[in-house]
């Protein structure tokens, strides 16, 4: 006789319901992916479906539309987001609430350390461990307010009333706890809740105790563990695979990758999503601003530039086109992303093969993804109304060597061999170490390029990076002036002494008179009107117009501005148009060089180049004058 006969109909239903729950729990427990067992690309349904018939060898595919072999109706997964009214997504309530906040670092203002030796000692220890002032970070609220540094017209912008959901992915390794959590809270506080599906923290084998159980306890205590997930690796994977692992676990329609020392500005999300909703093969990058590594002050980096590279594979920037400058709130095409900050539809990411899994730790991933986005019929834009601030580490390199040899050259070789066609030889000529590296097995990535019927790198250079050669040519143009720069008053020469970025420099005895003196005095006035040591891409740079403004060395960007100098022949002055000042040294030649108001009668501002091509100098400076007009 069955038990059911002794139960009421209601009790019978309850038992059936409980049994169903137990069954579902068993199924979930069986199939759930462990945070400690990240999947391979082949286990991602979209990637598996797309890659199962990747071509082998020279197998050819029939003529297809630009969206080559991407599936049937799934070619347009975001059609449901089109045709809706455009609305303002500004969160005025949150904005007004932030206005009332007070405390250290609020509104992105700088914070200073307390003036006592014990604090300085502790702060230095944290500085060395992180590469930024983590002591200051601990003084600032995790929910701090920030200054709205967007263009004023951004607050008037409207976007589709219906937008895709997102997974925000933060890979990190030994990140300082409060800096990591502030990154998380900036996303939660400034994202529409209906769009933010999850935040995935990818812990790349961190050893700091605070990043283990205390971090998980914090998320639970503050009731954000339902949206913030932690994925932990079992060994050091590196930044590239960390992002990949996060993408593999993501469930949002759009993936957004951010560094774990970031703070998002107001209404940062809709400007990233709207272009992707219009075309799922569009990748969108925010403007990246600066969080000062010393004070945590948030300030704008600039008002935009197009990403690019030089032929040593250093990331560089190209100026905006006239059309882009006239539309300061409109997304603009950019050949190459900076790397750490971008949004991409999950479908497009996996159709492109995700990140090349042969890339180790970091380096080259921004080129690999940028080239294949453009060459494989997608596009990439920067969105001026989406702004995210980033800490650029300074002074200390806190992480251990990966112990993998020259992985950067190997990464670059993989990118060049798959995507750059005959242009790779120019790269190898400038960086022989890349050409000599072992790229490993490239069959999968070359197969993806073939299946997507991607365009040539020659097309990319001529249509997308069309002005690349003007600013970063494969063959360096002749200098307008070169050699020693002799200071008339002291009879000493400018010597940059092989110093690095952000360092100041001064005068030393001229090398032509002191063959054993060493130093770095062979300088060039280039076609971009910047001054740089021979063979190096580091330039004289002046960033302020105050009296006795310092002149430092900074990575050459070939975009003039702070690095634009003119040589005034009759007065022998080195003039800096942006500050309106002239290069000056003390009479005895001691101390660092600086800028002062121009005085044509002062010998302290007179400089003699060793060699000048007068005709070329006049021609270039005349052209520069026309451009400025």
UniProtKB/Swiss-Prot annotation:
Cytoplasmic side: 1-12
SMART domains according to UniProt: RICIN (SM00458)
Function: May catalyze the initial reaction in O-linked oligosaccharide biosynthesis, the transfer of an N-acetyl-D-galactosamine residue to a serine or threonine residue on the protein receptor.
Membrane topology field: Single-pass type II membrane protein
PROSITE patterns assigned: RICIN_B_LECTIN
Regions crossing the membrane: 13-33
Family: Belongs to the glycosyltransferase 2 family. GalNAc-T subfamily.
Disulfide bonds: 154-385, 376-454, 493-510, 539-556, 582-598
Entry keyword Cell inner membrane: no
Native species: Caenorhabditis briggsae
Main localization of the protein described in the UniProt heading: Golgi
Ligand binding (substrate): 204, 236, 362, 393
Pfam families: Glycos_transf_2 (PF00535), Ricin_B_lectin (PF00652)
Keyword presence, Nucleotidyltransferase: no
Entry's free-text remark on domains: There are two conserved domains in the glycosyltransferase region: the N-terminal domain (domain A, also called GT1 motif), which is probably involved in manganese coordination and substrate binding and the C-terminal domain (domain B, also called Gal/GalNAc-T motif), which is probably involved in catalytic reaction and UDP-Gal binding. The ricin B-type lectin domain binds to GalNAc and contributes to the glycopeptide specificity.
Gene name of the record: gly-10
Region (Catalytic subdomain B): 331-393
Annotated protein name in UniProt: Putative polypeptide N-acetylgalactosaminyltransferase 10
Reaction(s) catalysed (UniProt annotation): L-seryl-[protein] + UDP-N-acetyl-alpha-D-galactosamine = a 3-O-[N-acetyl-alpha-D-galactosaminyl]-L-seryl-[protein] + UDP + H(+); L-threonyl-[protein] + UDP-N-acetyl-alpha-D-galactosamine = a 3-O-[N-acetyl-alpha-D-galactosaminyl]-L-threonyl-[protein] + UDP + H(+)
Molecular function in Gene Ontology: carbohydrate binding; metal ion binding; polypeptide N-acetylgalactosaminyltransferase activity
EC number: 2.4.1.41
EC category: transferase
Metabolic or biological pathway: Protein modification; protein glycosylation
Record InterPro entries: GalNAc-T, Glyco_trans_2-like, Nucleotide-diphossugar_trans, Ricin_B-like_lectins, Ricin_B_lectin
């Amino acid at each position: 006789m069955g038990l059911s006969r002794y139960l009421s109909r209601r009790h019978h239903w309850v038992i059936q319901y409980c049994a169903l729950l137990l069954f579902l729990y068993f199924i979930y427990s069986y199939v759930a992916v462990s945070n400690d067992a990240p999947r391979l690309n082949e286990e991602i349904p979209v990637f598996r479906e797309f890659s199962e018939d990747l071509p082998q060898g020279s197998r050819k595919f029939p003529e297809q539309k630009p969206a080559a072999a991407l599936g049937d109706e799934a070619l347009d997964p975001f059609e449901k987001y089109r045709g809706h009214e455009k609305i303002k997504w500004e969160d005025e309530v949150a904005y007004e609430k932030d206005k009332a906040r007070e405390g250290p670092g609020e509104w992105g203002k700088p914070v200073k350390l307390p003036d006592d030796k014990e604090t300085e000692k502790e702060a230095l220890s944290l500085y060395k461990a992180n590469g930024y002032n983590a002591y200051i970070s601990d003084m600032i609220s995790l929910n701090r307010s920030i200054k709205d540094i967007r263009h004023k017209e951004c607050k008037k912008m409207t976007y589709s009333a219906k937008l895709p959901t997102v997974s925000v992915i933060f890979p990190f390794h030994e990140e300082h706890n409060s800096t990591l959590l502030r990154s998380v809270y900036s996303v939660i506080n400034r994202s529409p809740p209906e769009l933010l599906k999850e935040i995935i923290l990818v812990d790349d084998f961190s050893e700091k105790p605070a990043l283990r159980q205390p971090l998980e306890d914090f998320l639970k205590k503050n009731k954000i563990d339902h949206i913030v997930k932690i994925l932990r690796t079992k060994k050091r994977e590196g930044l590239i695979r960390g992002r990949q692992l996060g993408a593999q676990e993501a469930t949002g329609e759009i993936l957004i990758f951010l560094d774990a020392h970031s703070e998002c500005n107001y209404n940062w999300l809709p400007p990233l999503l709207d272009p992707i909703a219009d075309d799922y093969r569009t990748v969108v990058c925010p403007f990246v601003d600066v969080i000062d590594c010393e004070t945590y002050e948030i300030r704008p980096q600039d008002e935009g530039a197009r990403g690019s590279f030089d032929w040593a594979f250093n990331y560089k920037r190209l100026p905006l086109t006239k059309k882009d400058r006239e539309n300061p709130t409109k997304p603009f095409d950019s050949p190459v992303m900076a790397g750490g900050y971008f949004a991409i539809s999950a479908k497009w990411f996996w159709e492109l093969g995700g990140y090349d899994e042969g890339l180790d730790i970091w380096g080259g991933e921004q080129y690999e993804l940028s080239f294949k986005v453009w060459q494989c019929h997608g596009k990439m834009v920067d969105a001026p109304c989406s702004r995210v601030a980033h800490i650029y580490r300074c002074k200390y390199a806190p992480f251990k060597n990966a112990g993998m040899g020259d992985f950067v050259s190997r990464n670059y070789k993989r990118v060049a061999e798959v995507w750059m066609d005959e242009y790779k030889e120019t790269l190898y000529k400038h960086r022989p170490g890349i050409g000599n590296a072992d790229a490993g097995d490239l069959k999968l990535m070359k197969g993806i390029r073939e299946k997507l019927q991607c365009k040539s790198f020659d097309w990319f250079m001529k249509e997308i990076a069309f002005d690349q050669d003007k600013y970063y040519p494969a063959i360096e143009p002749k200098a307008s002036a070169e050699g020693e720069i002799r200071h008339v008053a002291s009879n000493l020469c400018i010597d940059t002494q092989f110093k690095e970025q952000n360092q100041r420099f001064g005068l030393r005895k001229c090398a032509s008179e002191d063959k054993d003196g060493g130093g770095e005095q062979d300088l060039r006035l280039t076609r971009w009107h910047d001054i740089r040591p021979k063979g190096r891409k580091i330039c004289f740079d002046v960033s302020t117009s105050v009296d006795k403004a310092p002149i430092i060395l900074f990575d050459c960007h070939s975009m003039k501005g702070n690095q634009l100098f003119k040589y005034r022949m009759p007065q022998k002055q080195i003039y800096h148009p942006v500050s309106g000042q002239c290069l000056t040294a003390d009479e005895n030649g001691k101390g660092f060089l600086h800028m002062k108001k121009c005085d044509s009668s002062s010998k302290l501002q007179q400089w003699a180049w060793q060699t000048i091509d007068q005709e070329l100098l006049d021609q270039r400076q005349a052209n520069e004058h026309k451009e400025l007009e």
